[in-house]
């Protein structure tokens, strides 16, 4: 995604925020909303990683507490030409992962316990390579800023509906227009998230496949995570749906209306794109849908396949 398009999308989110402010407090409300949006962006720039990681109860690990995971991240970060990010684990049964941080020097990769327990080493490597691709593409800051502003738009819109908006406009079309904008603004914010997310996910899939060297490792992981997301709820994501687009697979994808406003491209389309990429990069990797565990005989193996599979998320 070009920097110009990204800037325009973020400007659109800010304009929605100002529009809600205007409906609540007139011109002064719009000005306050602009100042608040600017302050939020500055605050998010410096605190984005701590905010999101704290929200999901992520715990930082090192080579002593999670040696296999940390070594895998270090190996893949080296292949990607990135500094070593901090590594976190979230105690959550849904297999999923995200990356955050304002730049590659201050990045973090977080995975759930469900991801480590349900995926093979090769699939896990594909997921981590995908998240490192987000870091390399500088997507991590954009994802967090978008989530922050979109969440604020929803919150302020609900506040405006509760208090009835700007009372000077509370008759005739003014009231109808105010209510319409307060209802539609959060939907508009979701559409902006979709526009950003769809493009960056395809790009991260391709770069992640190149980093790990086997597109089918990531393709297999995507299929497994997508199936689990329809069955295993992510309670923290339910409480903060504006952060759903940060994950490799939408953690809300099995929940009603979220399918109509999906923040991610179709998983099947992503898998198909990775299958096409296999011919260019070479190697078939793991077959989609196979049980988690070591690579089958004859399939390309990762540097981590020679060791026994870890029994828990910390090994």
UniProtKB/Swiss-Prot annotation:
Q: Which cofactor does it need?
A: Zn(2+)
Any one GO CC term of this protein is: plasma membrane
Q: Where located?
A: Cell inner membrane
An annotated GO BP: proteolysis
Spans of biased composition, class Low complexity?
288-303
Active-site positions, per UniProt? 131
Keywords, ordered alphabetically: Cell inner membrane, Cell membrane, Hydrolase, Membrane, Metal-binding, Metalloprotease, Protease, Transmembrane, Transmembrane helix, Zinc
EC supergroup of this enzyme: hydrolase
Q: Which Gene3D superfamilies match?
A: Metalloproteases ('zincins'), catalytic domain (3.30.2010.10)
Tell whether Cell membrane is among the UniProt keywords.
Answer: yes
What protein is this chain from?
Answer: Protease HtpX homolog
Species name? Rhodopseudomonas palustris (strain BisB5)
Q: What is the lineage of its organism?
A: Bacteria, Pseudomonadati, Pseudomonadota, Alphaproteobacteria, Hyphomicrobiales
